[in-house]
Curated annotation (Swiss-Prot):
Keywords for the protein's UniProt record, in alphabetical order: Endoplasmic reticulum, Golgi apparatus, Membrane, Protein transport, Signal, Transmembrane, Transmembrane helix, Transport
UniProt topological domain (Cytoplasmic) ranges: 218-229
Protein name, UniProt field: Transmembrane emp24 domain-containing protein 5
Organism (species): Homo sapiens
Record gene name: TMED5
Cellular component GO terms held in the UniProt record: cis-Golgi network; COPII-coated ER to Golgi transport vesicle; endoplasmic reticulum; endoplasmic reticulum exit site; endoplasmic reticulum membrane; endoplasmic reticulum-Golgi intermediate compartment; endoplasmic reticulum-Golgi intermediate compartment membrane; Golgi apparatus
């Protein structure tokens, strides 16, 4: 079994908020959005562990960017060790699960390959829906005295969450496009090398055949009779 890697929660930094909003900064819906690209050698297996809260939505997307066959075995297990997803010889996949408290394990297995390493990209997206309702309630105690503003605190929260959601989706799409571009570029470079190799082989064969033809034609016109003295 390969190395085990723990993926920590990212830290969300909030800046430039009015003082009245700072105590309620926890009201934003916490989310995780991270990606990772690594090389998995032939005959090896790599596992990652992600700690999860209760009643969260975890989305895992992976792609094989480079390597013969562009395929990999994928395994996702719950904190109790129950297999949630098991795929064999896949080039990509997307899976979403509702989580419970504990460490989720997901592995990429390249043991079926003896000579070809694989370049793998995966992305994790966690939407912690379990705490959203309580956090929205926590905001209400900061509403008093904010009516003097042109916008109420609920309106500010709604606008910020909307912007945050759209920025998150934009970042997710850009990450996927970069992954697609990397895989397509690797395929094109592989095709380019293959075309160059066989073009060189074809050129060598043509030169050899031409030389043989010239030799055979020349031999037809040679006078093989021996002159007597």
């Amino acid at each position: 079994m390969g190395d085990k890697i723990w993926l920590p929660f990212p830290v969300l930094l909030l800046a430039a908020l009015p003082p009245v909003l700072l105590p309620g900064a926890a009201g934003f819906t916490p989310s995780l959005d991270s990606d990772f690209t690594f090389t998995l050698p032939a005959g090896q297996k790599e596992c990652f562990y992600q700690p999860m809260p209760l009643k969260a939505s975890l989305e895992i997307e992976y792609q094989v960017l480079d390597g013969a066959g562009l395929d990999i075995d994928f395994h996702l297990a719950s904190p109790e060790g129950k297999t949630l997803v098991f795929e064999q010889r896949k080039s990509d996949g997307v899976h979403t699960v509702e989580t419970e408290v504990g460490d989720y394990m997901f592995c990429f297995d390249n043991t079926f390959s003896t000579i070809s390493e694989k370049v793998i990209f995966f992305e994790l997206i966690l939407d912690n829906m379990g705490e959203q309702a309580q956090e929205q309630e926590d905001w209400k105690k900061y509403i008093t005295g904010t009516d003097i503003l042109d916008m109420k605190l609920e309106d500010i929260l709604e606008s910020i969450n909307s912007i945050k959601s759209r920025l998150s989706k934009s970042g997710h799409i850009q990450t996927l496009l970069r992954a697609f571009e990397a895989r397509d570029r690797n395929i094109q470079e592989s095709n380019f090398d293959r075309v160059n190799f066989w073009s060189m082989v074809n050129l060598v064969v043509m030169v050899v055949v031409s030389a043989i033809q010239v030799y055979m034609l020349k031999s037809l016109f040679e006078d093989k009779r021996k002159s007597r003295t």
